[in-house]
A protein has these predicted regions:
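Acidic, polar-rich low-complexity tracts and alpha-helical solenoid repeat scaffolds
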Residues: 2-7, 27-274
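Intrinsically disordered, low-complexity terminal tails
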Residues: 10-12
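Bacterial N-terminal signal peptides
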Residues: 16-27
Length: 274
């Protein structure tokens, strides 16, 4: 499955125009600064500038630490929110999934009405969304029963929250594309599992898994093979009525399906259902 997605934008651009003003206000008014702070009294604005410079230079670890300090010292301000999102974004770039998710979840809990809420949900979805693997990266090399799809489901829920809460967000169109991709990939995974069972002679399990895929994911490309698997499995089980019913649905909905009249290749034998 090949799908092109937009690259992740820099954090919460809608906050950017407000952040510098907040930083200046903190500098003039004094945002919760401890005189014994390891930053030696550096202004919030200066710290933020340094953090951005470090991030631009690729020194993500140093930038993350600075954003952590800003988050604490500017607590309750838009600058603190921006620092959280910048921090989460850099952790995401460094593939530190657990830490990145923790920061985003903290942001959403502390700032449920933030103007950058849509970006937070979008980033949360991206963290769980593994585009490179695409659910099929090393599928043939791995026992299907060992693969966990929870991260994919979590990503879907984050994107759904974004689309439902912020339908006009600039991130919504890409989130919708990713949601569709996830649904198709999850359905294909379920069919892969059904095929896995079938090829190992677990025909009842194969039929049940294929049927579940059809119930959970309607109108997906993998539905064709799911119907074929049901018919093939019922044929192996000697359940002619159920086999014929699955065959009828397949032919009715996909009259030109390549699965009609074919079977799976097996080292021991070839077989054809129709």
């Amino acid at each position: 499955m090949t799908t092109m997605f937009k690259p992740c934008p820099t954090p919460a651009l809608r906050l950017a125009s407000l952040v510098l003003g907040v930083a200046v206000a903190c500098q003039l008014g004094g945002c919760a600064t401890d005189p014994k702070n390891v930053d030696d009294g550096k202004s919030i604005a200066k710290l933020y500038e340094e953090a951005r410079d470090e991030a631009s230079a690729g020194a993500n670890d140093r930038a993350i630490k600075l954003y952590e300090r800003i988050e604490g010292r500017a607590a309750g301000t838009l600058l603190s929110q921006q620092a959280q999102l910048e921090q989460a974004f850099l952790l995401y770039k460094q593939q530190e999934k657990a830490r990145a998710l923790a920061v985003v979840e903290r942001f959403l809990k502390l700032h449920p009405t933030s103007p950058a809420g849509d970006y937070a949900y979008y980033l949360q979805g991206l963290i769980n969304f593994n585009d490179d693997l695409g659910f099929f990266g090393n599928l043939a090399k791995q026992d299907l029963s060992e693969r966990d799809q929870q991260a994919s489901r979590d990503a879907y829920q984050s994107f759904k929250q974004l689309v439902d809460r912020y339908p006009d967000s600039k991130y919504a169109p890409d989130a919708k594309v990713r949601m569709k991709y996830i649904v198709n990939a999850l359905a294909s995974y379920e069919v892969h599992v059904a095929r896995y069972y079938y090829m190992r002679g677990a025909y009842l399990a194969a039929a049940n898994r294929a049927q579940q895929a059809l119930q959970d994911f309607r109108g997906v490309p993998a539905a064709e093979e799911a119907l074929f698997l049901m018919a093939a499995s019922y044929d192996k089980l000697g359940m002619a009525a159920l086999r014929d019913d699955a065959q009828r649905v397949l032919k009715t909905n996909y009259p030109r399906s390549p699965w009609i009249g074919r079977g799976y290749e097996d080292k021991a034998s070839w077989w054809r259902l129709w």
